[in-house]
UniProtKB/Swiss-Prot annotation:
Associates with the 50S ribosomal subunit. Residues 369-453 form the KH-like domain. PROSITE patterns: G_ENGA. It comes from Campylobacter jejuni subsp. jejuni serotype O:23/36 (strain 81-176). GTP 1 binds at residues 8-15, 55-59, 116-119. Keywords: GTP-binding, Nucleotide-binding, Repeat, Ribosome biogenesis. This is GTPase Der. InterPro entries: G_ENGA (IPR031166), GTP-bd (IPR006073), GTPase_Der (IPR016484), KH_dom-like (IPR032859), KH_dom-like_a/b (IPR015946), P-loop_NTPase (IPR027417), Small_GTP-bd (IPR005225). Residues 2-164, 196-368 form the EngA-type G domain. PANTHER family: GTPASE DER. GTP 2 binds at residues 202-209, 249-253, 313-316. The lineage of its organism: Bacteria, Pseudomonadati, Campylobacterota, Epsilonproteobacteria, Campylobacterales.
Length: 460
């Protein structure tokens, strides 16, 4: 697995970028220079490829401690595959940054200059000054506002080779391919179609308990205006159209710096509950607005590959425009959950809460959907005919056949001659075509490419 290291002087936003790329808060972030002194690392995925992301300590000669941090950082950089050097876009380039950057460039590894904190037009104009670093790969970012990351991800993806799959999915896929006979329908795992497990998640005081009470029409959880009233997870089941829907009301997730005692335990329970859920109701506060913590909680949902419905609670108090809000969520804040339906409700008044029950049944049906192999391959043939697969350095890239190998969530294998040549943008095109033909609203769609007649996903 390739590794990506974030390097730069203190307080340029390395930890914030690390948290953004990891979709969770791992490194401590602060306005105080040099908050991160130790090396943090975590596995991430960029589009369909996985990598190890490393957050180094800040490069600074101002004290003895940071001299050691710099020495360690350079050592880790030598062992890494890709280097991202961060600078502060609100400050003019300085010779110290150039010196650090050139010393890293000599390592002969893929390296990019990341200009962070480019938050407005004035910052964009100033960022051009960094062109004198003499590097082609310069990316202007605003990590705080989640702007500019798509271009960076596309550049990084070119250097990553190892395909990302859900944990344990690699073994499942290889086992499937070993026993699958081309052209035959596959016997899927049994999923109880009459019992649906739904996790209710969101930050503190967005109205999760009120929503649960409205859904089951009784006071089951303690409801209060005090942030974080609900600590213990509460299960409640309802029967809707002959289906049992089991709800789990999770304790609200606070900002990490405020988590103490029972609240920290509740955060761990929340992730555990998601791991046992099939569908998540991601509850947002439409009256108070959205923040970075909402995005991190959404990242937990995406991490578990659940069916998902985004619930805009307290809509009766909101002044937001619904269409503009949905566009903001899908194109900006929750791009990785762009397939999720968005429903506005008022849990306290019960308005539109009933819509959620029907939507849960629909999403669960999509979540457990089985695609007939012949129909899937007809779609793939038509899609590749309309937009042929790009050649790989002059060599033909072919998809021999496609087959769904799992459900809940649905997973599709593309058997190819050159699986590594399948660019994420073409994979996304195929995903979009499949979503158009088959209803996968609210459901993640996993596509894995493999070499024909081999367990390997490469050219060897």
């Amino acid at each position: 697995m390739q590794s990506i290291i974030l390097i730069g002087k203190p307080n340029v936003g390395k930890s914030s970028l690390f948290n953004r790329m990891a979709r969770q808060r791992i490194a401590i972030t602060s306005d105080i220079s040099g908050t991160t002194r130790d090396t943090n690392k975590t596995q991430i995925h960029i589009h369909s490829k996985k990598a190890m992301l490393i957050d180094s300590g800040g490069l600074d000669e101002s004290d003895e401690l940071f001299k050691n941090v710099k020495k360690n950082t350079l050592k880790v950089a030598k062992e890494s595959d890709i280097i991202l050097y961060l600078v502060d876009g609100k400050l003019a380039p300085d010779d110290e940054d150039r010196q650090f950057f050139y010393s890293l460039k000599k390592l002969g590894k893929p390296i990019a200059l990341v200009v962070n904190k480019v938050d407005n037009k004035k910052d964009e104009e100033r960022a051009w000054e960094f062109a004198n670093f003499g590097v082609k790969e310069i990316f202007n970012l605003s990590v705080t506002h989640n702007v500019g990351l798509d271009e960076l991800y596309e550049w990084l993806e070119k250097f990553l080779h190892e395909e990302f799959l859900i944990p344990d999915e690699e073994e499942n896929l290889e086992d499937f391919l070993e026993h699958y006979e081309e052209g035959k329908e596959f016997q899927f795992k049994e999923v109880d179609q009459n019992h649906i497990r739904v996790g209710i998640v969101g930050r503190v005081n967005v109205g999760k308990s009120s929503l649960l009470n409205a859904l089951v029409k009784q006071e089951r959880s303690v409801v209060s205006s005090i942030a974080g009233t609900t600590i213990d997870p509460v299960n409640e089941s309802v029967v809707h159209k002959d289906k049992v829907i089991e709800f789990v009301d999770t304790a609200g997730i606070r900002k990490r710096g405020k988590i103490q005692g029972l609240e920290r335990f509740a955060l761990n329970r929340t992730e555990k509950i998601l791991s046992h859920s099939q569908i998540a109701l991601l509850v947002l506060d439409a009256h108070e607005g959205f923040n970075e913590l909402d995005e991190r909680i959404a990242g937990l949902v995406a991490k578990h590959y659940l069916g998902v419905i985004i619930v805009l609670n307290k809509w009766d108090k909101s002044e937001m425009d619904f269409d503009k809000t949905v566009k903001e969520l899908r194109l900006d804040r929750f791009k990785f959950l762009a397939y999720a339906p968005v429903i506005s409700v008022s849990a306290l008044s019960g308005k539109r809460v009933h819509v959620l029950l029907d939507k849960i049944l629909q999403i669960f049906e999509n979540f457990t959907q089985k695609i007939q192999t012949s129909k899937l391959n007809t779609l793939i043939e038509n899609a590749t005919r309309a937009h042929p697969l790009p050649h790989d350095y002059g060599k033909l890239v072919k998809i021999y056949y496609a087959v769904q190998y799992d459900l809940a969530p649905p997973k599709i294998a593309l058997i190819m001659n050159r699986p590594k040549a399948l660019h994420f943008s073409y994979k996304r095109y195929l995903q979009n075509q499949i979503r158009k033909e088959f209803n996968f609203e609210g459901v993640p769609l996993v596509i894995a490419s493999r070499k024909k007649g081999s367990k390997e996903n490469d050219e060897s």
